[in-house]
């Protein structure tokens, strides 16, 4: 992926359509002392796709049933996050206003998400098909000014936070 840092050269293992009866484990060695906290192995199939990656002192290991082109990339980019409802400094008409945000991560993928109102957790659902976080509106918000904060993290540990102020009746 263009926006990711290439960790080392790509490596090709056999042909990508070669059938495998059982999954194989592939380990990519790394220099001792390398910080691997944001590094994953990606497989190229029409585009780069993150593979579940085990990290150890000896290297990066994946288990796969498909061979082909692999490369390690470091993801230092936080997910895209944008509050879509309500607008800033919104004066709500109800104690359960609609609270939504758009989220996407084109690199290692969305791994975690949440929202709070003045530090109190809100029950939030994530719709990956539409890239949307939505408060379930399961209980009333407290009256007064509420700082609503959405957050999202990716598989590399990068985190985005966005907030909006809502005045609740």
Q: Language-model segments: which ranges?
A:
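Proteolytic processing hotspots in large secreted/extracellular or virion-associated proteins
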Residues: 1-45
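Short, solvent-exposed loop/linker segments at the N-terminal edge
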Residues: 18-20, 89-95
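Short edge beta-strand/loop segments characteristic of extracellular beta-sandwich folds
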Residues: 25-31, 98-106, 151
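Short, surface-exposed beta-strand/turn "edge" patches of beta-sheet domains
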Residues: 44-66
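Long, low-complexity serine/threonine/glycine- and acidic-rich segments characteristic of extracellular
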Residues: 59, 106-169
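C-terminal beta-strand-rich structural cap/linker in extracellular carbohydrate-active enzymes
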Residues: 61-78
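Extracellular Ig-like/FN3 beta-sandwich strand-entry sites
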Residues: 65-67, 96, 143-147
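Proline-centered linker/hinge motifs at extracellular inter-domain junctions
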Residues: 76-80, 86-87
């Amino acid at each position: 992926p263009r926006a990711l840092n290439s960790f080392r050269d790509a490596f090709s293992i056999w042909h990508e359509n070669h059938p495998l009866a059982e999954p194989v484990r592939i380990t990519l060695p790394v220099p001792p002392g390398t910080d691997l906290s944001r590094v994953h192995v990606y497989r190229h199939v029409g585009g780069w796709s993150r593979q579940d990656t085990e990290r150890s002192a000896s290297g990066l290991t994946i288990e796969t049933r498909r061979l082909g082109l692999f490369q390690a990339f470091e993801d230092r980019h936080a997910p895209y996050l944008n509050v879509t409802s309500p607008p800033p400094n919104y004066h709500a008409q109800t104690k359960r206003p609609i609270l939504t945000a758009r989220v996407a991560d084109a690199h290692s993928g969305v791994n975690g998400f949440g929202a709070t109102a003045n530090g109190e957790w809100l029950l939030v659902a994530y719709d990956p098909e539409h890239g949307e976080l939505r408060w379930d509106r399961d209980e009333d918000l407290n009256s007064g000014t509420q700082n609503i904060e959405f957050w999202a993290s990716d598989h590399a540990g990068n985190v985005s936070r966005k907030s909006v102020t809502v005045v609740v009746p």
